[in-house]
């Protein structure tokens, strides 16, 4: 990795690389490399329990903007989600969770779900929708969970641009297409082809917005 300085005097780490991380036993040294990259405002591509996604520190505004440029979307209209390490972490970024909702979240997480919840004041404005909501995830993926826990901040979760999802199951294909656009591409084995199931929990009853990889039975 090469360290340099920006025009404003801040430092950055040039950590552009293709990094293999074992899906069941993530190597601490490689996790540390990813964490250092995120701390310095880097953008990564990482595995989840569904499809591979773009990620960065949610508190690094320029990194979030960079991901939006890669996806060619307006940051204020992108409806981006982010990954938390556990329910305790998730509760910091949403308003008070009542017992029924907590039980619901606990029964489905970790898992291939994105829950739309009312955002707390800790959520950066760039990530909030006009309705003051945010999509939150806790993927059932060891690499993703380890990165978020070691990093200490939530990780932005954004799908890769384009409609050819089958191309994004192979990390090598991802590298061929995106290596010049991001800082680290993590090879955590083959990815999935189906995105997460999205459920809106901002009303009294949960509402299914998108059926994805996670099973869901509406009451």
Question: Model-derived features: where do they sit?
Answer:
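N-terminal amphipathic/basic-hydrophobic helices that include classical n-h-c signal peptides
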Residues: 1-16
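Active-site-adjacent structural elements in enzyme catalytic cores
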Residues: 14-219
């Amino acid at each position: 990795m090469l360290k340099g300085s920006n025009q404003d005097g801040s430092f950055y780490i040039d950590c552009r690389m293709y990094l293999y991380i074992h899906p069941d036993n993530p190597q601490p040294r490689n996790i540390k490399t990813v964490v250092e990259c995120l701390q310095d405002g880097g953008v990564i591509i990482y595995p989840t329990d569904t499809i591979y996604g773009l990620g960065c520190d949610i508190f690094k505004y320029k990194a979030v903007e960079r991901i939006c440029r890669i996806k060619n979307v307006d940051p204020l209209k992108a409806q981006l989600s982010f990954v938390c390490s556990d329910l305790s972490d998730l509760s910091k970024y949403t308003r008070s969770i009542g017992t029924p909702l907590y039980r619901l979240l606990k029964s489905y997480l970790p898992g291939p779900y994105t829950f739309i919840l009312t955002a707390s004041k800790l959520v950066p404005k760039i990530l909030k929708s006009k309705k003051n909501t945010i999509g939150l995830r806790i993927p059932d993926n060891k690499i993703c969970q380890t990165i978020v826990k070691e990093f200490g901040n939530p990780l932005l979760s954004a799908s890769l641009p384009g409609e050819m999802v089958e191309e994004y199951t192979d990390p090598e294909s991802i590298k061929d297409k995106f290596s010049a656009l991001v800082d680290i591409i993590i090879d955590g084995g083959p990815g999935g082809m189906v995105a997460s199931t999205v459920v809106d929990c901002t009303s009294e009853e949960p509402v299914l917005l998108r059926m994805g990889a996670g099973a869901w039975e509406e009451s």
